Amino acid sequence: MNVTGLYLIVAAIGIVLALIAYLRNRNNIGGIIIGFSLMEIVIMAVIGVINGVLGTPNAMLGRLFMTFSGSYGFLAFAAICGFFYISGPLAAYIIRKPGAATIAETMNGVAQVLSGNPNGVMVLGAGFLQGFMSDMAFAFYGYKNWTLPVVALSGALAPLLQQIPEVYFFGVGDMGLGYNLVALAIRMVSGAVYAVVLVRPIARGLARAGVVRGTAVAAEEGKARLHGQVA
């Protein structure tokens, strides 16, 4: 198997996962398209823009790795890619509606382009793919399971399709099958780790501060606080 074959399989896996998510939610398909409140739209935009603006220096650091680290540069870059994937799981965890991760990550891509990301307009597509696959993790559970393992899965799935265009953009397709598998694995682990470490603490901190009033996570935090007072 060559690298092209590998990424055809990866793309097929992504499509199958999306199909499974659809089938698991097909009986509630009427509720899948849910409108967002103005506050939720603002939250998704702000999360995406902040992560995107901060992601541009991260991308520059990745370029530095690839310039001075030779064949290991892309792998080193993969280890910090989890930062790019945070806006999807974070927005989804706060809002808890289908599409929140996709919208936030797409806004992330827009912000990266406007803030001078050295990788150019490619990051727009990358942002959409990251968010779409992040959404799939929550879709598997009907957008009803918001536990830490599912948050980790959301971060891990983000690069599954996103790495495909980047491999050809950065020209590492010729590095071989094993190299590309390792790069994908590192990105998935990085996505999971960043999600586990950052998503819930940030979301709960924002809820306690009253910044995300009217969202699902704010309601959950309010109930937890009330329960603690009653206890």
For the regions a language model picked out, list residue spans one by one.
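Interfacial aromatic-anchored transmembrane helix boundaries in multi-pass membrane proteins
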Residues: 106-135, 169-170
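Short helix-perturbing small/polar motifs within transmembrane alpha-helices
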Residues: 17-23, 37, 43-48, 125-167
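Membrane-helix interfacial "entry" motifs
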Residues: 32, 36, 40, 73, ...
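Transmembrane helix-loop junctions in multi-pass membrane proteins
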Residues: 54-65, 98, 111-117, 165-169
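Membrane-embedded alpha-helical hairpins and interfacial helices in multi-pass inner-membrane proteins
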Residues: 1-10, 59, 67-73, 144-231
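Aromatic-anchored segments of alpha-helical transmembrane domains
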Residues: 48-55, 106-115, 155-165
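Hydrophobic alpha-helical transmembrane segments
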Residues: 41-45, 82, 86, 98, ...
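Hydrophobic transmembrane alpha-helices
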Residues: 2-91, 204
